[in-house]
């Protein structure tokens, strides 16, 4: 979906965008854990040989900017599976098309309104180890990156998740135009401000 080889363990820690069930986090411990993961990501982006942030830009880009942690943006969701996993050709930042299959729709309530986001995998994926959820919202192009943000979701056996927008992150093309990053499809554009997660670089 996108190149993200920097500190794989870091991204597992940072991007557990959804857990195995809809339990609410303990606010203090949750905030502490999330802030620690953000510091770890900054350190990796600053020092890793395969950092997506060009060396000459690191002082300007790092530390990465975020909205304050808000547990209200960690919401329970149910995954409605797609019967036939239709293929979508997602435009990308390089102009190429990325063929993705829709696994299903994550259905949830946010700010009192029912909403949904499509969850995708690369075409031909046999064993799903993560679901890819690109999205845009009313902060896109303002406080957040103009091409949208991503969530990574670990599949569960129950079909129930916790979507955590505090863990929304920028695609690598936000820092370096040489990366190819899929754009969120129109169906994954939320008509609400998601003031959680990573902001646009330099915001």
Language-model segment annotations:
Residues 14-17:
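C-terminal motif of bacterial Sec signal peptides marking the signal peptidase cleavage site
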Residues 81-146:
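Mid-length scaffold segments of soluble, non-membrane domains
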Residues 30-105:
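N-terminal secretory signal peptides
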Residues 133-169:
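Acidic, glycine-rich flexible loop segments
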Residues 173-203:
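C-terminal partner/receptor-binding element of secreted or periplasmic proteins
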Residues 19-22:
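Bacterial signal peptide processing site
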Residues 87-91, 156, 187:
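Terminal leader/tail segments of proteins
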Residues 1-8:
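Bacterial N-terminal signal peptides that target proteins for export
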């Amino acid at each position: 979906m996108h190149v993200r080889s920097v500190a794989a363990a870091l991204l597992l820690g940072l991007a557990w965008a959804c857990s195995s069930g809809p339990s609410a986090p303990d606010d203090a411990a949750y905030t502490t854990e999330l802030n620690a993961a953000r510091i770890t990501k900054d350190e990796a982006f600053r020092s890793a040989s395969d950092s997506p942030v060009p060396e000459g830009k690191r002082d300007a880009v790092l530390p990465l900017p975020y909205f304050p942690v808000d547990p209200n943006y960690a919401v329970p969701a149910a995954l409605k599976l797609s019967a036939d996993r239709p293929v979508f050709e997602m435009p990308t930042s390089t102009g190429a098309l990325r063929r993705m299959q829709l696994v299903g729709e994550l259905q949830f309530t946010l700010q009192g309104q029912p909403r949904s986001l499509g969850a995708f995998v690369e075409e031909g994926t046999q064993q799903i180890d993560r679901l890819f959820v690109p999205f845009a919202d009313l902060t896109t192009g303002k406080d957040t990156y103009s091409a949208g943000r991503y969530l990574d979701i670990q599949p569960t056996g129950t079909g129930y998740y916790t979507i955590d927008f505090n863990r929304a992150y920028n695609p690598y093309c936000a820092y370096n135009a040489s990366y190819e990053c899929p754009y969120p499809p129109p169906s994954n554009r939320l008509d609400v401000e998601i003031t959680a997660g990573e902001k646009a670089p330099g915001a």
